């Protein structure tokens, strides 16, 4: 071992692991070179070491770059050191979902009537039933309400129920995150607007005018299940309480200024969706009673329904925008499709861990969720590259990944650069990851994974400081710069 880089013997072992795994995982034909082409260890290692030293990250760094078609390892540093994957976990979730669900899978949201419709009146209950659609939004609910009117419904004799039991209701993705961060919402079988509500405030003659609404491009329905009170204090900025069936928030007056807005997480997404649907139905002249939860899916006739985009489109957007809720919904749905019945994210992630072991022989990785938000997830660069090689340079994952561009001396993306990258980024506090595929200027395909984390600094953060820790932004910028410089170097050194 020299400066964390692998000498010939261990590089060969890792190369064999990467190449051999591909056959077992997805049945993809790969051509194996009998031995990876080895280059002089000294200059190669020193080049990467200089970049790492210049980044001044501290902590631990692990990376592997390999030929994406043969699995031959070209360079590695701490390849079997397990580090936080952050949102690169979504690449694993993507392949897990594609293995368990058809690529044209859709989530369906339905409006059911448990009795006949006579003279515009539902002689029974009306039911809003979800299957977990992670991209259901207010505009879509408005379309369902319009469809209800078009079907001739004007009133309901029974109750207005909502069903969200297709997936378990989980109030948060990661309990270690601050209460108010919108990237850590609830997850359920009936979701809306990525389970976020818009808090908006304006200065008034006596304090502030405050609204909480389910805003979309076309609508601003206010909600009552999430409430905000302005409190005369300096800190904490936000507090949250689950009170009498509502999300009860307070905000410190000292931070509000003259006005602004912010998305906050919703902890009762099914009730949120039902309340918004009730409001939108009223705009079409349909008066619904207060929504109540249905413990089981009622039997009834479908009046109107909405299908989500197909799975591949959902995965593409999930990888592009790194939406945590989408990852958790799709991951749990995949586990259910595989015969599992998890009641927690960790339980569903355990099923994904088992799948990694059974299909790829990856048994050291540990995921605690499907998004990478949880701090307990760990994977080694060698195992992530093994997954990428198994998926294939021409396989299902690469076209779903977003393009990443190398940068010029001023940090601007060079979109016409001959080196092309498709990858997934990942960022947590003092942890950064980038993993994906590179096409070099002369056409060679590489698979890579880079993981960087300062675990000591991460461990010192308290819950309140995790949204914007001191020094976190500059650390993340240096980490991302290092990752791109490593890729640029690999593309130059290991071109065909």
Locations of regions flagged by a protein language model:
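Short active-site loop at a secondary-structure junction
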Residues: 59, 76-96
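A short, well-structured edge-of-sheet supersecondary motif
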Residues: 53-77
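A short glycine/serine-rich beta->alpha loop
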Residues: 77-83, 263, 371-374
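N-terminal export signals
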Residues: 2-7, 11-29
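Conserved serine DD-peptidase/penicillin-binding transpeptidase domain
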Residues: 28-53, 100-363, 442, 460-466, ...
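Small-residue-rich helix-loop
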Residues: 335-496
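Residue-level preference for non-acidic, small/hydrophobic
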Residues: 71, 90-97, 160, 190, ...
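Structural recognition of the beta-strand scaffold that forms the well-ordered cores
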Residues: 64, 127, 326-329, 366, ...
